[in-house]
Structures are given as structure tokens and as C-alpha cells.
Amino acid sequence: MSYPADDYESEAAYDPYAYPSDYDMHTGDPKQDLAYERQYEQQTYQVIPEVIKNFIQYFHKTVSDLIDQKVYELQASRVSSDVIDQKVYEIQDIYENSWTKLTERFFKNTPWPEAEAIAPQVGNDAVFLILYKELYYRHIYAKVSGGPSLEQRFESYYNYCNLFNYILNADGPAPLELPNQWLWDIIDEFIYQFQSFSQYRCKTAKKSEEEIDFLRSNPKIWNVHSVLNVLHSLVDKSNINRQLEVYTSGGDPESVAGEYGRHSLYKMLGYFSLVGLLRLHSLLGDYYQAIKVLENIELNKKSMYSRVPECQVTTYYYVGFAYLTMRRYQDAIRVFANILLYIQRTKSMFQRTTYKYEMINKQNEQMHALLAIALTMYPMRIDESIHLQLREKYGDKMLRMQKGDPQVYEELFSYSCPKFLSPVVPNYDNVHPNYHKEPFLQQLKVFSDEVQQQAQLSTIRSFLKLYTTMPVAKLAGFLDLTEQEFRIQLLVFKHKMKNLVWTSGISALDGEFQSASEVDFYIDKDMIHIADTKVARRYGDFFIRQIHKFEELNRTLKKMGQRP
């Protein structure tokens, strides 16, 4: 059900939950509408337009009705019902459409009314006010000029504590359901605000003594342990790992879900928390642990849990980045190519929602840059359409990387890597001006060292492709290296081109050592023997598959034409 301001011209039947049409503030006269909106922008936040008041009341009634219905379902020992599903759908419409449109119209660069101002409109409903504050502070972080103040950062943290305490510390399952998109956004924003605060507290140059004292006296606010504790608690409460384990083995996850995990709220929060842990460990530079938390998620299969595109894109971005830093180049390339192909095929779907499109488009660009790095360091064949996109975006930069230009590597890594952070509270008495950059600089140094070790490999590969046998000393001369230096570089080539590659199994950490290099060689005394291992592209199979698809389509069209 849409919020009536979105379709005020329609002549729909009376709906007791809808707003009367006279609450819509459009007069039909563009000049009057513009004058009204300008007048509103000059008012204080305590003066709330009727359209916003009634939107809040409608929003509250929808959430309140859902909670009442959920209480009834829990008392009847039922997990869900069509009524619950309908209410969740209504909340999703409010969340994704009405809230976004009203924000754009009234609060584009200013905060929504404070919770205290709208509390009388909703009967001081504690649960609704927690949900409202979650949206309120998220909007301040995203759109309000200057971002959140120190006080607002603390208040947002306390609000998340209240939300998670309500969900985790209830005597039984909390009588609440929310759309999957909102649940994902809660986890995503929770980690983003922790990341933002970790950077904020390290930048002390422009902070007053009062602010620094306030930070010093509250070290547990946005503490990494509390963030990890929330995510692990949601995972444990939902029993999501056991559910995924049973699901991937073909069983019924409901059979092991437990009292809480049977409910969509807990199940989806548990799943999204696993992705949140992947992201958090990546931000902290612990890539092995980042992938390990997903050991029960089979990335190479479509999952019933992956219903939110942003969650899927985020998962592949961080898994691909972790693979890249662990020198599992084949796996990184496979992961990036798969998700980029998915984005390419579904891009039009995201363009309907601006905020989704912006986020996915940014990660899409970052993953193209990471794929360019991975393919330069470990050349292999990928999907032709992705390869074409990559050449258009980064063709020149890839050529420069192949020639060993470290500046391009650093530029692409800096653009596409996550915003690394330090979990440690800084020493406020002596904070270095670039202290907030140290985690990034450390990761950049490790990456640059790896690039430096492989600087000669691209040139060596191009020479090896030209010959089948050659004296080691002669080939070393072509490269202006001594024979001993060249033998060392050949050993480096062998070592770096052999990767741990996922082949089967659920855990993304599983794998066996393989080499997908297009050339291989061995040294017999003073001679190097080279073999071209490149597999010729089998065009015949491609055309046969397309012919079968065309014939199937033809048969389907003929059947459709025969219908009366």
C-alpha cells in the first residue's frame, strides 16, 4: 500500500489507514508549492508540517499493527502469516518509497524532526521511536551538511544499543518483523558508523579540549569489542551457521533453527551479521578470519538468503579483496568477474532507486579496478563482456602496470581498497596528524612489497612465450640480469604463479594449489625448456549452445502462436 502523497490524484476506495487527500500539501500551483517549501525550510524543526505529522502517524500505525499481529502469532505459536507478510510489505513501501520521497522534498540537506518532537504524535511508543531514530541518524550521516556532531555520534550508538538489546535480550522472540532491505541497512549502517567514528576520533587537530576530554572519558563508545559482540550475538541467537550448514547439505534449515532462528527477523539479521563480520575483519586487515566467518555460505550457488542486492555485492567485494591480498588471484578474479557480470545484467533494476544505484555503482567501479590489478598480476581468461569493459576503463593503466609502473598499482589500490581502520583508541595526548591514515598506509606498504617482488614477472612471461628452448645465460642477457639473478626470478615466477584455488566444498578457504599461467617451463642443466599451456578457445561449443537456445526459443514461440 502506497503512502497517499505518492498518488494523490488517484480515486482509490477509502482506506482507513491512508491519509485524507487534503493532507497532501500540493495545491496544483507550482509557485504556491515552491513558496510553501521555502517557507518550511526557514522554520524550526519543532514546526512540523501536517503532511509529515500524518506520515509519522501512518508509519507508526503500520509498525504498531504489525507488532500487535506478531504478538498474536507468537501467542498462537505461529512463526508468520499472510497478515504479517502484508504488513511487512506496507512497511517496505513506506521505507523505500515514501520516506525517500519526503526526505527529498523536505529534508534534502537538513535533519528530520527530532524524536522528542514527534514522540507525542506516536504516543511515546518506545519501539517505534528507536526505529525512527535509526533512520534519523542515518540521514544525518548521509545527507546533512557537516555530518553528525560528537553528541549525535554518541546518541546514535546508544540508539543501536537499545535496538539490539530489544531484539537480543527479550524473554522470547521480539514481536517485530522488518523488510529484509531495512535489516541489511541496519547492519550495514551500524558498521559504517563504527568505521566513521574510528576515523573521527583519530583526527584531533580541529577538536576542542572539551571534545577530546569527552572522547578520552568514553573509550567504550563505538568500541570494537562491543561491535563484534553485537554481530556475534545476532549470529548465535539466530543459529544461522547451523541453518546454513543444513541448507547447503540439502536439509531443512527450519529443523535446526531453534526458537529464535525460525523467525525472519533473527534469521536475516544473523545472515547479514555474517557479512558484517566479513566486512569488519577486512577493515581490520584480518583477511583469513574475514573469509572464515562465511565458511557455511556457498558463494558459488544462488542462496535463498541473498535477497538484497547490496548485501550480495558487498559480500563479493570483500571476499574478492580478501582473496587478492591473500595472493589467491584466481579466486579473486573468479569472484570479481561473477559479481560484475551480475551487476551488468541487473543494472537497470538498481537505477530505479538512487541511493542503491550510487552504492552499487561505486563498488562496481572499485571492483573493476581490483580486477585490473589481479589480471595484471595473474593473467587468465575471463568473460568477454567483462574483459571489454575492463579494457575501456583501465586499458592504458593495465599496460603501464604490465611494464611495472608501481605508481599505477598504488593509485588503483588506494581508490578501490576498503577504508581500513585501527581498533585501538588513540593516545589523545600525542596523536600524530596522519594517525588516521596509518592502517591504510600499512596495507598499502604490504601490497606494494608484493608488487615489487613480481615487478619482473610480466617481462619474463613475454620472453618465455617467444621460445621453446633457450640457454639460461642467453635469456638472462636479454633481461640485463646475471644468470644467478635470472634463476632467482624464475623461481619467483614458479612460486607466484602457483595459487591456492577453490575447486569444491562450501568453505571459501578450501582449495588446492594450481597454476593457470599460459606458460610453464623447467630447467635442465643450463637449458630452459618452455611449454605453451594456453588452451585454444573452443568456439564450436559456444555456437552449438546458442543454436540449441535458438531452437528452444523457436519452439516456444510456435506454441504461443498456436494458442486460441
UniProtKB/Swiss-Prot annotation:
Entry keywords, A to Z: Acetylation, Cytoplasm, Initiation factor, Phosphoprotein, Protein biosynthesis
Any one of the GO BP annotations: translational initiation
Major location category of this protein: cytoplasm
Subcellular location, record wording: Cytoplasm
Database matches in PROSITE patterns: PCI (PS50250)
Modified residues (N6-acetyllysine): K465, K549
Domain PCI, first and last residues per copy: 331-537
Signal peptide extent: none
Role: Component of the eukaryotic translation initiation factor 3 (eIF-3) complex, which is required for several steps in the initiation of protein synthesis. The eIF-3 complex associates with the 40S ribosome and facilitates the recruitment of eIF-1, eIF-1A, eIF-2:GTP:methionyl-tRNAi and eIF-5 to form the 43S pre-initiation complex (43S PIC). The eIF-3 complex stimulates mRNA recruitment to the 43S PIC and scanning of the mRNA for AUG recognition.
Quaternary structure note: Component of the eukaryotic translation initiation factor 3 (eIF-3) complex, which is composed of 13 subunits: EIF3A, EIF3B, EIF3C, EIF3D, EIF3E, EIF3F, EIF3G, EIF3H, EIF3I, EIF3J, EIF3K, EIF3L and EIF3M. The eIF-3 complex appears to include 3 stable modules: module A is composed of EIF3A, EIF3B, EIF3G and EIF3I; module B is composed of EIF3F, EIF3H, and EIF3M; and module C is composed of EIF3C, EIF3D, EIF3E, EIF3K and EIF3L. EIF3C of module C binds EIF3B of module A and EIF3H of module B, thereby linking the three modules. EIF3J is a labile subunit that binds to the eIF-3 complex via EIF3B.
Protein name (record): Eukaryotic translation initiation factor 3 subunit L
Gene: EIF3L
